[in-house]
Amino acid sequence: MIHISDAAQAHFAKLLANQEEGTQIRVFVINPGTPNAECGVSYCPPDAVEASDTALKFDLLTAYVDELSAPYLEDAEIDFVTDQLGSQLTLKAPNAKMRKVADDAPLMERVEYMLQSQINPQLAGHGGRVSLMEITDEGYAILQFGGGCNGCSMVDVTLKEGIEKQLLNEFPELKGVRDLTEHQRGEHSYY
């Protein structure tokens, strides 16, 4: 469910050493399955453990996950990265905003999942997003861009060199992607 790197475990163990005996960590998702989902880590004293929690035992600690958050933390990774600028704890949870879909789910659901979990987080750095409008009978994914992508001069490159390549690599049954967006350049456009 969740992978916690050795460096992150050591970081948590150091923090937990200063807490009440028996205190562990809790990993959770607020507003799971929505565009506003946010992940977090907190201390979990012994009296805060619920019977319905999942206990994930690691070498240096135990991480508790509540029943509601569990499916949205599938494939989550926690790491502690140190570079010349300092140290940082990172939590990546690709399924926090949308529950992972089965490999045999309809093509529309699998494409939508990939857009939400892999493509949109990349576009969000520029204030953009993409939505799947339909998949045609001919096998084309019809997409609509929004936010900073609408009117951006790089949208064609993003569509063909980024999104289309990733989708065709993952879903060979697709023939390509098409952009439905009526692009209007403005203050919102990234480039």
From Swiss-Prot:
Full protein name: Fe/S biogenesis protein NfuA
Cofactor note: Binds 1 [4Fe-4S] cluster per subunit. The cluster is presumably bound at the interface of two monomers.
4Fe-4S recorded as keyword: yes
Lineage: Bacteria, Pseudomonadati, Pseudomonadota, Gammaproteobacteria, Enterobacterales
Species name: Citrobacter koseri (strain ATCC BAA-895 / CDC 4225-83 / SGSC4696)
A Pfam family recorded for this sequence: NifU
Protein family: Belongs to the NfuA family.
SUPFAM superfamilies for the chain: Fe-S cluster assembly (FSCA) domain-like, HesB-like domain
Transmembrane segments: none
InterPro entries named among the record's database cross-references: Fe/S_biogenesis_protein_NfuA, FeS_biogenesis, FSCA_dom_sf, HesB-like_dom_sf, NIF_FeS_clus_asmbl_NifU_C
GO biological process, one term: protein maturation
Underlying gene: nfuA
Function: Involved in iron-sulfur cluster biogenesis. Binds a 4Fe-4S cluster, can transfer this cluster to apoproteins, and thereby intervenes in the maturation of Fe/S proteins. Could also act as a scaffold/chaperone for damaged Fe/S proteins.
Keywords: 4Fe-4S, Iron, Iron-sulfur, Metal-binding
Cofactors (names): [4Fe-4S] cluster
Listed GO MF terms: 4 iron, 4 sulfur cluster binding; iron ion binding
